[in-house]
């Protein structure tokens, strides 16, 4: 019995396990389909419930009956107009929708509605629902593809609210607690059939737990299997049940046969045969089959109408799913086509962009090459322009616009309209004439944002030319408060970025001189002067005395104020100390227009002397850095007392500067340099051979527009002045030697002419050097000398005129002159004469001097090479004929610059004697027979009153006693095209 019970337990356990496995497999396959179908069925039942309640509430509307069990499309079309919803809401809560827009009776269900009707009814319904606190939906849910489940929820909530009101509004209304859904008998059947399934599972679990202790009876096994089968097929369709039962039976039979075969083998091997008894298994299978048949019969006995409806509903849902699937596939195909088109377009765009980039690169390369060429041409043009400016001698004019000071911003308004490379445009209002924009052109224009370094870098080549032997003048001009002192010096608190032109210029000179120290040795010294109330004062005086200093133009070493302190400097620190000392001594005060107004003109003069270590030649250069005091109007500056006197002197000196510029621009014969100490100090720069730069400053404030326009007009007039090409101040050893030889010869001639029988000093003449220099020089005009064979009285030498007014235009007061009498000159020694630059004529004079020496030696050799006394005796008749009789004279060329210089400049005794040594040509002997007993005449000095001087200069050569009738020319002629001016002199 024990063995039989074990076999039964084994078989019963196996049958239950097999049934559970088969049911789990079928449940896993159909779980998804069942879940979807249950959800669809549940939503349909809710929709039917909502439609039934609406049908009960409104009945027939507009001759149309609302369907009791509509589909989603029918449900949406019935509610799309909003009339049904608004009417139901007014019945539940009267007055919720004040106005319902009715539709015509003949409008079909799917026809398009008017926009007003559609939006008015639906909007009013949704507003009222939200005010009542009920679940709402979107207006788009009424369209095709919308979420109808939200419409159903809203209607069911409204139904629950209506039922709550009908019950007397007992307690607070809650939609979740009050909502009762009646899903029909089918739902109740599902709910009832689920209970034995749960109980069967619990029983199966308890049976499994107790299987090891107690044997199971056949009745319990059959009940457990029956419960499992019933619970599984409860929610299945009719067509699925036979398949499930068949699979269960097949599986059970296979398992039973396998178990029986194993059991038979075990029985054969045992000693006691066990009778086969499979009655329990057959009983279980039969019971399950009976239950399945009963369930099928129950399903078949259900009404055919319900089955038909379910079938139609399933087909409709299947068709809807097919439509959705087809639409999705269609959208996928469209997206694929769009993606393909986009990729093709992107490839085309990529190719096009690559082509465009290639062409753009070629174009940019061409532009870059053109820009490089343009910069190169622009730089070359700038160099050529500067070269032309140097050759013409034009005064360079730079303009700088001061930025607005803190607290002076006038709402962004500025008198300056536009600033270009070399043009500045001023906005001119109507009160200054014709309103509009007026441009002014200069060499360079700096805007308010320009730095000190940018300003100096543009004038750096001009500053460096001082080391090459040129004279340079840079002066700042403008009204008071326009930033002149800031440009030239810098602010009160100096930094490396704010250093002015004065500091930067000297630092650059030190740097360049240090670079050239292997070839040239430079000595740099500084003077610092100021012109205060028309008095020249030394700002570097250690004792603090303000003694009056004299200005001497055309001095041999370029120092126009020799009495001022000349301090050698070798570094930037020395310059800063000197500048600080000068700024402390300079006159500065406060006015209504400027807190630190300069009350004087400041001039920093840098003297440079360089010596070439190879040739020994000496270069002289000077640079004037002038900070002019600003012009000011007394009514604006509000000055009185001493400040008023200072302003008057400042305006007077600036007015004199304007007169000088006007005369130079008009190229008049007389330039009034002596009208002011300022113009007298700047005479060498304005009328000489210097490179001059005027830095004009203006203010951007509209209040100073009048002064700005006048300043710019004056600067334009300055830019039109031509001074002539600048010259290098250079002395070489050959010129110095020739000057000494000519001075010794002239002194010997003068002594012999006075009857002093003095043997001349032997003068060594370096013929090789003279011939080499003559070969390098250009041909010059030689004086006409008669031949030895011509002994007639008509053969008279031509000499330069020294007695006329043109020869002594450069004159000063007699109190500052040394005596030029011949007797006093004889008593003095003959030192080496320094070279005096006389407007570019030094080279011509040197060549003429060399030629005169050649003629002089040839004359001595022809007369008597062994008797030098005879040569000096033969010069006595020449002296006699020199002062008596008819003479013709030739004057060398004098340029306009010389005449301008000579009109107002001082002339020292060394300058005059140098002119005598160069211009006077000794004539040849006209009569050798009368040279034995010479009768020298005593020289009678004659004074000539000059037109523009205050002193009388004695003439070295008296005028002839008779005036030629046809050769008198009282007025100097205008210079011809070749620059020559010839005069005939009489008494």
From Swiss-Prot:
Question: What spans are recorded as compositionally biased (Polar residues)?
Answer: 788-797, 964-974
State which tissues express it: Flower specific.
Show the InterPro entries listed in the entry: CH_dom, CH_dom_sf, Kinesin-like_fam, Kinesin_motor_CS, Kinesin_motor_dom, Kinesin_motor_dom_sf, P-loop_NTPase
SUPFAM superfamilies in UniProt: Calponin-homology domain, CH-domain, P-loop containing nucleoside triphosphate hydrolases
Which compartment or compartments is the protein found in?
A: Cytoplasm, Cytoskeleton
Which residues make up the binding site for ATP?
Answer: 478-485
Relate the protein's function as given in its record: Microtubule-binding motor protein.
What is the designated name of this protein?
Kinesin-like protein KIN-14G
């Amino acid at each position: 019995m024990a063995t039989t019970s074990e076999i039964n337990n084994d078989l019963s356990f196996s049958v239950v396990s097999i049934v559970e496995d088969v049911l789990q497999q079928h449940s896993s396959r159909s779980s998804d389909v069942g879940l979807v179908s249950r959800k669809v069925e549940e939503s349909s039942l809710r929709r039917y419930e909502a439609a039934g309640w609406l049908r009960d509430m409104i009945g027939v509307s507009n001759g149309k009956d609302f369907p009791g069990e509509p589909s989603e499309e029918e449900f949406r079309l019935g509610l799309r107009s909003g009339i049904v919803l608004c009417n139901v809401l007014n019945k539940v809560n009267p007055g919720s929708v004040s106005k319902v827009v009715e539709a015509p009776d003949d409008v079909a269900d799917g026809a398009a509605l008017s926009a007003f009707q559609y939006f008015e009814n639906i909007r009013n319904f949704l507003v009222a629902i939200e005010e009542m606190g009920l679940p709402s939906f979107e207006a788009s849910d009424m369209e095709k593809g919308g979420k109808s489940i939200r419409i159903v929820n809203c209607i069911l909530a409204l139904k629950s609210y209506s039922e709550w009101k009908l019950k007397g509004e007992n307690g607070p209304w809650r939609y979740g607690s009050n909502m009762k859904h009646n899903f029909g008998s089918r739902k109740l059947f599902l709910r009832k059939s689920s209970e034995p399934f749960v109980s069967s599972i619990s029983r199966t679990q308890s049976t499994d737990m107790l299987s090891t202790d107690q044997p199971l009876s056949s009745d319990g096994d059959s009940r457990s299997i029956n419960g499992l089968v019933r619970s599984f097929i409860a929610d299945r369709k009719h067509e699925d049940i036979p398949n499930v039962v068949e699979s269960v039976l097949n599986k059970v039979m296979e398992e039973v046969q396998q178990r029986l075969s194993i059991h038979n083998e075990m029985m054969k091997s045992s000693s006691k045969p066990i009778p086969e008894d499979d009655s329990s298994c057959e009983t279980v299978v039969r019971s399950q089959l009976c239950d399945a048949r009963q369930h099928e019969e129950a399903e078949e006995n259900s009404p055919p109408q319900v089955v038909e409806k379910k079938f139609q509903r399933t087909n409709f849902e299947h068709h809807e799913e097919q439509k959705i699937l087809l639409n999705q596939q269609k959208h996928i195909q469209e997206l694929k086509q769009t993606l393909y088109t986009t990729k093709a377009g992107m490839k085309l765009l990529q190719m096009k962009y690559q082509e465009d980039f290639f062409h753009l690169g070629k174009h940019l390369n061409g532009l870059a090459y053109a820009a490089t060429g343009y910069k190169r041409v622009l730089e070359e043009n700038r160099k050529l322009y500067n070269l032309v400016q140097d050759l013409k001698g034009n005064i360079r004019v730079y303009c700088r616009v001061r930025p607005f000071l803190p607290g002076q911003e006038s709402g962004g308004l500025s008198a300056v309209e536009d600033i270009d490379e070399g043009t500045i445009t001023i906005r001119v209002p109507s009160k200054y004439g014709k309103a509009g924009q007026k441009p002014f052109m200069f060499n360079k224009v700096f805007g308010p944002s320009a730095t000190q370094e940018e300003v100096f870098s543009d004038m750096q080549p001009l500053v460096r030319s001082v080391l090459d032997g040129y004279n340079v003048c840079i002066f700042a001009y403008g009204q008071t408060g326009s930033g002149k002192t800031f440009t030239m010096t810098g602010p009160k608190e100096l930094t490396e970025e704010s250093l002015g032109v004065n500091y930067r210029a000297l630092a650059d000179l030190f740097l360049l001189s240090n670079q050239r120290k292997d070839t040239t040795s430079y000595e740099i010294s500084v003077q610092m002067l100021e012109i205060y109330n028309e008095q020249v004062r030394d700002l570097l005086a250690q004792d603090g005395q303000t003694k009056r200093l004299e200005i001497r133009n055309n001095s041999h070493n370029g120092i126009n104020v020799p009495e001022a302190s000349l301090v050698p400097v070798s570094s930037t620190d020395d310059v800063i100390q000197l500048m600080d000392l000068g700024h402390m001594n300079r006159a500065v005060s406060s006015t209504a227009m400027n807190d630190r107004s300069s009350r004087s003109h400041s001039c920093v003069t840098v003297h440079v002397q360089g010596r070439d270590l190879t040739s020994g030649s000496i270069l002289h250069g000077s640079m004037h850095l002038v900070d002019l005091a600003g012009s000011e109007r007394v009514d604006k500056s509000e000055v009185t007392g001493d400040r008023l006197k200072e302003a008057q002197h400042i305006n007077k000196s600036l007015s004199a500067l304007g007169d000088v510029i006007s005369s130079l621009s008009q190229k008049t014969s007389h330039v009034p340099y002596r009208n002011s100490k300022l113009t007298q100090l700047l005479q060498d720069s304005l009328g000489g051979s210097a490179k001059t730069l005027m830095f004009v400053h203006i203010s951007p404030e509209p209040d100073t527009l009048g002064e700005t326009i006048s300043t710019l007009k004056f600067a334009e007039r300055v830019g039109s002045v031509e001074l002539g090409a600048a010259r290098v101040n250079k002395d070489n050893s050959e010129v110095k030697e020739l000057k000494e030889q000519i001075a010794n010869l002239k002194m010997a001639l003068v002594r012999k002419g006075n009857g002093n029988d003095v043997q001349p000093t032997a003068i060594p003449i370096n013929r090789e050097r003279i011939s080499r220099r003559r070969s390098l020089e250009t041909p010059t005009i030689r004086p006409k000398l008669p031949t030895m064979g011509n002994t007639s009285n008509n053969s008279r030498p031509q000499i330069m005129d020294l007695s006329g007014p043109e020869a002594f235009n450069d004159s000063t007061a007699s109190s500052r002159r040394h005596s030029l009498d011949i007797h006093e000159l004889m008593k003095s020694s003959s030192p080496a004469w320094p070279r005096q630059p006389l407007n570019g004529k030094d080279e011509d004079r040197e060549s003429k001097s060399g030629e005169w020496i050649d003629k002089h030696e040839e004359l001595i050799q022809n007369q008597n090479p062994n008797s030098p006394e005879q040569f000096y005796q033969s010069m006595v008749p020449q002296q006699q004929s020199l002062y008596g009789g008819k003479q013709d004279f030739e004057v060398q060329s004098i340029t306009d610059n010389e005449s301008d210089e000579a009109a107002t400049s001082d002339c020292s005794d060394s300058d005059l004697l140098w002119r005598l040594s160069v211009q006077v040509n000794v004539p040849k002997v006209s009569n050798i027979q009368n040279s034995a007993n010479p009768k020298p005449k005593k020289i009678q000095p004659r004074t000539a009153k000059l037109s523009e001087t205050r002193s009388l200069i004695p003439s070295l050569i008296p005028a002839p006693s008779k005036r030629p009738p046809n050769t008198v020319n009282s007025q100097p002629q205008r210079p011809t095209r070749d620059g020559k001016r010839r005069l005939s002199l009489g008494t």
